[in-house]
Structure formats: C-alpha cells, structure tokens
Swiss-Prot record:
Record keyword Oxidoreductase present: yes
Gene3D superfamilies registered for this protein in UniProt: NAD(P)-binding Rossmann-like Domain (3.40.50.720), UDP-galactose 4-epimerase, domain 1 (3.90.25.10)
Ranges in a coiled coil: none
Main function: Festuclavine synthase; part of the gene cluster that mediates the biosynthesis of isofumigaclavines, fungal ergot alkaloids. The tryptophan dimethylallyltransferase ifgA catalyzes the first step of ergot alkaloid biosynthesis by condensing dimethylallyl diphosphate (DMAP) and tryptophan to form 4-dimethylallyl-L-tryptophan. The second step is catalyzed by the methyltransferase ifgB that methylates 4-dimethylallyl-L-tryptophan in the presence of S-adenosyl-L-methionine, resulting in the formation of N-methyl-dimethylallyl-L-tryptophan.
Pathway membership, UniProt: Alkaloid biosynthesis; ergot alkaloid biosynthesis
Native source species: Penicillium roqueforti (strain FM164)
Protein name, as recorded: Festuclavine synthase I
Family stated for the protein in its record: Belongs to the fgaFS/easG family.
Length: 287
C-alpha cells in the first residue's frame, strides 16, 4: 500500500508526511512545489494543470513503491475546486485507489458548497472508502501572515468572529487523525469534526497571548467586508475564496459552536493540544 499525500507543503500534509515517514509507511508527496531537497519521495502535482494529475501514478515505479491505494485529498484554494477534485477522484479510482481522506471544514456539511460537494461525491461511490475530516480553525493560522505580523508588530489579532467561540485545533492533531484514518483499514464511509479541547473567542486568545508574550494583545473585530478585503489585499487570496472564508468567520459570530466532541482522542488515543500549550511552544515566532 502506498499513500499519496496531496498539498505536500501545507500545514497538515507536511505533518502527515513526517508521521508516515516515522512509521515507515510507504507514501508519495504530490505538490506543485517539489524540490530535489525534499526528504520525501515526491511527484509534481498541480490542481491547475490536469496533465500533472497522472504523475504520481506513473512515477511510483522509479521510487520503488507499490501502487497507490489511498489518497490524502487536499483541494486547491478556489471556489472552483469541485470539478477538478471530482475528476481527479475518478482518475484515482481508475488507478486502483480504494480510500480517500478528504480535508473539509467543520462548518461545511456533506452536500454543501465546495468541499461539501466532494464529500457527497465520495459518499456516492460504491466500493470506495472515505473519511471526511472537518477541522475547525487552525491554531497555526496565527503563525502565518498577516496574523503573525499583526501580533508581532501591532499587538493584535484580527477576525470577523466577534465574541463567537471556536474550538481551535492544532495541525499536528489533524495530521494525527489523518494518519490513523489512512493506515488503519476498515469499512469506512464516515466523517470526523475535529475540534480542540476548549472553546475560545479571539478575545480570549488575545488574553492568553498577552500572558505568554508579556505585552498587551488585543482583538480587532472586523466586518465581513473588511475581513474579505484584508484576505485579498494582504494575503493575495482569490476574491471568491476570501469571501467564503470571511462568511465562515461571521458564522462563528452568529452561530457560535457551544459543544465539544472527543474525536481526536477517539481516533488517535491522545487528547488534542490546548491553545496555551501551542502558544508557549511557538512564542518566539511572535517576538
């Protein structure tokens, strides 16, 4: 069994690759930014270049790997993700892939827009196993710009969530769940909403950062339109995807999550990481 890991340098895919490597599980990384310096077997894969989709299946022989039987499915950051992802799923199935682990989002139900439609398509395929991972907000988003720069230089976190609370999750915990879903075979057509162990507003996140960094961090609350513009102007996110991301933030404000589940511990045997633990470990990146 060889596992294809798409989104090779992404937050969860890079961590999943490290777990698979440590476990000596055969895998191949598919990424648009492959490098000869990569420590892992890799193949050029670009969602926007259909001619690259066959590369991982054609190149496994040169890496001394068995045929690909499972795929970690991370889509492109665009609202037009559904047609290419479904086409790739069909290609992968024709090559003998038996299982997919799809990365979706906690507030995108099966059959909804974007990843929700891919989720529904996987569910409709006979003889195909899948697990849809639906994580909440990543703690690691605070380590990336513009949030990292805002924390470091402007002493603030920025969101459109108001005082809505989020069960922030670490990418390490998501990768651990994905690892178990990919390597522990069984009859699966299921989903996991992946949450952290506590509900926090961005205001509470700011308070935790204040206590760790030794300087006052505040929460700047934006409107949906203001946050959309920031995602486009400061991150370079496509406008339609930025609008979807901002709308998801506003959903937190209007319909806050008030319950927690134990999915991480259920799947991995270990509880998820608390935000304070994460922030203490990463604090030098905000100094």
């Amino acid at each position: 069994m060889t596992i294809l890991v798409l989104g090779g340098r992404g937050k969860t895919a890079s961590r999943l690759a490290a777990l698979l490597d440590a476990a000596k599980t055969p895998f191949l990384v598919g990424s648009s930014s492959t490098s000869q310096e990569s420590p892992y077997n890799s193949s050029h894969f670009n969602w926007y270049e259909k001619t690259t989709w066959d590369n991982p299946f054609a190149e496994i022989g040169k890496h001394g790997l068995q045929p690909i039987s499972a795929v970690y499915l991370v889509g492109p950051p665009t609202m037009d993700m559904v047609p290419p992802m479904i086409q790739f799923v069909d290609l992968a199935c024709s090559k003998g892939v038996q299982r997919f682990v799809l990365v979706s989002a906690s507030n995108i139900e099966k059959g909804d827009h974007s990843m929700g439609q891919v989720h529904a398509y996987l569910d409709s395929l006979p003889g195909v196993e899948y697990v849809a991972l639906r994580p909440t907000w990543f703690m690691e988003n605070l380590l990336e710009d513009p949030q990292r720069t805002w924390i470091k230089n402007e002493s603030q976190v920025v969101s459109a969530t108001g005082e809505g609370k989020i069960p922030f999750i670490s990418a390490d915990d998501i990768a651990s769940v994905a690892f178990h879903c990919l390597t522990e075979w069984g009859s699966h057509k299921t989903e996991y909403i992946i949450q952290g162990p506590e509900l926090l507003s961005y205001g509470q996140v700011a308070e935790i950062l204040t206590s760790i960094l030794g300087k006052k961090i505040t929460h700047r609350s934006l409107s949906e339109a203001e946050y959309t513009n920031i995602l486009v102007d400061e991150i370079g996110m496509p406008a339609d995807f930025a609008a979807m991301s901002a709308a998801m933030e506003v959903d937190v404000k209007n319909s806050p999550q008030e319950t927690l589940n134990g999915s991480v511990e259920e799947v991995t045997g270990n509880p998820p990481r608390f935000f304070r633990t994460f922030a203490e470990h990463e604090k030098q990146k905000w100094v």
